[in-house]
């Protein structure tokens, strides 16, 4: 892409911003060729009558920018107009037209319609395996709550029918759950299954396993998972956290201390499952569902976890700095 005078502005020696450093790292670690190959068969080709589509690489980059910076379609369009760094990452020159919010929306719907978000997570993980990242040892399962708007002040005067409320501790939440299965050693997400918030964690355990693990770790919400019918053929050992009441019921102090040490060990292994949640919620700002319905939000969450995997191992993937 040829530089214009607008593009050349600010290319002199100056401090690199955190945004520029982050995007430079993502430029190197995202498997662009594999992702573009997944989407290309479904993306409209140029040369037909009418307005020509934007380059697929540009639209994919804009879509990923939306996930990293938690931007809506209108906000993404405005950010491309205002922020030179984002425009440069999207490969839009100073004289190029910026995709409007409807074009950005249509690209996201194309990914949702063809179920490409799940395949993007698979493509990212396959690329990480090729680069030496483990994704086939033990699995840790857990779920996080994602809030949804509980107000009925909208056109339908109703809440999203696919979202439900649940109680955690003494607090009530309305929204959905995002259960995930992560690798025991690397902490990378390999399976995601979004559900309504009121569905018990243990009911989707089978959907979070890849089938080759030798151990499964989970908190007390997964008690009895190994006895469920859909997991009878699973040969992995289940290491589920004991409930506090079970530990307190042990009368012998020595046995109780031994059981507590065992629980501490299991908790230290399970800690890795919290890292992807931190990345998507704190690093990428995903604290509330953006769309109505589980299908659209599941596609969004799948993309976020694919990007969180890349973010967590970016240091190992980047070339060594001298």
Spell out what each predicted region is.
Residues 31, 51-58, 96-100, 265, ...:
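Secondary-structure capping and boundary motifs in well-ordered enzyme cores
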Residues 58-70:
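Alpha-helical support elements that line or immediately flank enzyme active sites
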Residues 2-5, 74, 78-81, 91-237, ...:
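Polybasic low-complexity intrinsically disordered regions
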Residues 1-33, 37, 319-322:
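Charged, often Cys/His-bearing segments associated with DNA-binding zinc-finger transcription factors
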Residues 38-57:
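An N-terminal domain-cap segment
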Residues 36-44, 125, 277, 281:
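Amphipathic, well-packed alpha-helical segments that form the structural scaffold of globular domains
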Residues 260, 283, 316-322:
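A short, flexible helix-boundary coil/loop motif
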Residues 3-9, 214-215, 220-295, 299:
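Helix-centered, glycine/charged polyanion-binding patches within enzymatic domains
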């Amino acid at each position: 892409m040829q530089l214009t005078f607008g593009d050349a502005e600010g290319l002199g020696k100056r401090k690199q911003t955190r945004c520029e450093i982050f995007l430079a790292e993502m430029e190197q670690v995202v498997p662009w060729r594999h992702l573009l190959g997944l989407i290309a068969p479904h993306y409209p080709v140029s040369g037909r009558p009418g307005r020509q589509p934007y380059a697929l690489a540009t639209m994919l980059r804009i879509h990923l920018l939306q996930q990293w910076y938690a931007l809506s379609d209108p906000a993404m369009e405005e950010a491309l107009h205002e922020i030179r760094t984002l425009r440069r990452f999207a490969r839009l020159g100073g004289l190029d037209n910026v995709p409007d919010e409807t074009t950005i929306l249509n690209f996201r719907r194309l990914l949702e319609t063809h179920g490409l978000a799940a395949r993007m997570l698979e493509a990212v993980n396959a690329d990480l395996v090729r680069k030496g990242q483990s994704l086939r040892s033990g699995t840790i399962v857990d779920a996080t709550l994602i809030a949804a708007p509980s107000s009925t002040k909208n056109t339908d005067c109703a809440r999203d029918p696919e979202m439900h409320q649940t109680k955690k501790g003494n607090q009530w939440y309305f929204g959905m759950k995002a259960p995930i299965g992560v690798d025991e050693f690397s902490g990378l997400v390999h399976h995601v299954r979004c559900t309504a918030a009121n569905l018990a964690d243990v009911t989707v355990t089978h959907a979070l396993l890849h089938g080759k693990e030798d151990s499964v770790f989970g908190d007390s919400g997964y008690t009895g998972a190994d006895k469920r019918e859909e997991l009878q053929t699973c040969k992995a050992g289940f290491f589920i956290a004991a409930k506090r009441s079970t530990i307190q019921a042990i009368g012998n102090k020595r046995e109780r201390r031994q059981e507590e040490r065992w629980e501490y060990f299991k908790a230290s292994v399970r800690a890795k499952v919290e890292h992807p949640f931190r990345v998507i919620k704190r690093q990428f700002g995903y604290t509330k569902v953006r769309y109505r319905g589980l299908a659209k939000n599941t596609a969004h969450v799948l993309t976020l976890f694919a990007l969180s995997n890349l973010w967590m191992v970016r240091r190992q993937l980047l070339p060594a700095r001298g």
